[in-house]
Amino acid sequence: LASEKIKDSDGILPVVESMSEISGITSVLLASEFLSSTSGGKGVMLGGVTGVTPTEVVIIGANTAGEHAARAALGLGAIVRVFDNSVHRLRNFQNLMGQRLYTSTFHPQVLSKALKSTDVLIGALAAEDIRPWFYVTEEMVKGMKPGSVIIDLSVDSGGCVETTECRALKDPLYEKHGVIHFSAWNLPSRVPRTASIALSNVFRPLIQDIADAGGITPMMKFNNGLRNGVYLFNGILTNEPLGQKFGILSKDINLLLAAF
């Protein structure tokens, strides 16, 4: 059972949504620290004060993580620019934020120009939106200002910045082409108490429903959301994309449950 694939009654992935909220907000707080001189940054504050030009933040991905990163950055007074490969998501993003923001689809020249002046780049693309090519190339990173910060939240799914590396949690910070990189896989683990409470809010009612149904198998029969998270059932692979990726035969979970 893959908890991140379980859906609620509204068709939302509650585990992913909760962790994305935490990742988005935490990424901005970390970027603020990395910009400080004590962390080897440029010695600037993320945001702005009266009479001082505010810092600029570029966010790649108009999703939940991107939304909460944008809210945190805007709350600090930063200039925020958002890029995504879907006009529909960008439009929804604008509506959710309740204000006009700089948004753009992925035009290499436009993105490259924005990166030359930005102080922080946050990659928030979901795994299913990452393509074999990188949205932010190494050449674009070379053009960024020295001491700028890159936090790629999708590094464990391939990343959307060519220069990001999936590093150990104990050594996540490194510099490349004069730009500070933070390997941000499993970012919620840096705030474990908050993450644990958020996960408990998701799992407690689910576990109660499973108990009331008499077990997980009876629950799966009438709960489509729980069924969506099943990868293996009685030793049989039920996730077709996973089977295609590794060349393993998979079967429809609905057909298997009919026998129980």
Predicted features, each with a name:
Residues 40-126:
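Glycine-rich phosphate/diphosphate-binding loop of Rossmann-like nucleotide-binding domains
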Residues 4-30, 34-45, 155, 160-260:
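Adenosine-phosphate binding glycine-rich loop
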Residues 22-26, 64, 68, 84-88, ...:
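Conserved active-site and cofactor/substrate-binding residues in soluble primary-metabolism enzymes
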Residues 1-3, 83, 124, 153, ...:
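Generic beta-sheet signal
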Residues 97-177:
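Rossmann-like adenosine-cofactor binding region
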